[in-house]
Amino acid sequence: MNFIVRHETPADVSDIYQVNHLAFDRDNEAQLVDVLRREKAVILSLVAVLDGQIIGHILFSPVSITNDKFQWQAVGLGPMAVLPEFQNQGIGSALIRSGLDELKKLGHDVVIVLGHPEYYPRFGFKPSKPFGIQWEIDVPEEVFMVAELWENALAGKQIGRAHV
């Protein structure tokens, strides 16, 4: 399959909504993308395109890690969606790898994700708890993960809770 990964354009908005809706079989993630876009809280939004059709989408947005004394910025991955008929064909992996590569080039150092613990470790994600980072609401430890885009990117960072 010969697809390309490129930046989202304004013409892609309705197709991106549809991809997220169909991939998750609900509107929550599609609506989240629209809200983040409307609030200008998007760092990077990429689409996978095959023969002119958007078949996948990934979005990265700012996340604050805070405690009583400190705050620092990370990047949140999600949602990431692939049309059901194109899942398990490497499209999601290509979107994640392209996104992480571009974020690194942009100078970002830490990415967090709330996702499947069997899937995301292949991209360098590890449970966040050993790094002292927790999600703003209680979630199972194994689904909240962090990736360092640079070696030792978390060294010296203050522990805290992640907030969108």
Please tell me what each predicted stretch does.
Residues 1-32, 39-55, 150-152, 157-161:
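Short amphipathic alpha-helix that is part of the acyltransferase structural core
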Residues 131-147, 151-161:
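Non-DNA-binding regulatory cores of transcription-related proteins
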Residues 47, 53-64, 74-81:
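Conserved beta-strand in the GNAT
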Residues 77, 82, 88-101, 113:
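Conserved acetyl-CoA-binding loop-helix of GNAT-fold acetyltransferases
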Residues 63-76, 87, 106:
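A conserved beta-turn-beta hairpin within the catalytic core of GNAT-like acetyltransferases
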Residues 61, 95-99, 127-131:
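Short acidic (Asp/Glu) patches
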Residues 105-109, 114-140:
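Conserved active-site alpha-helix within GNAT-family acetyltransferase domains
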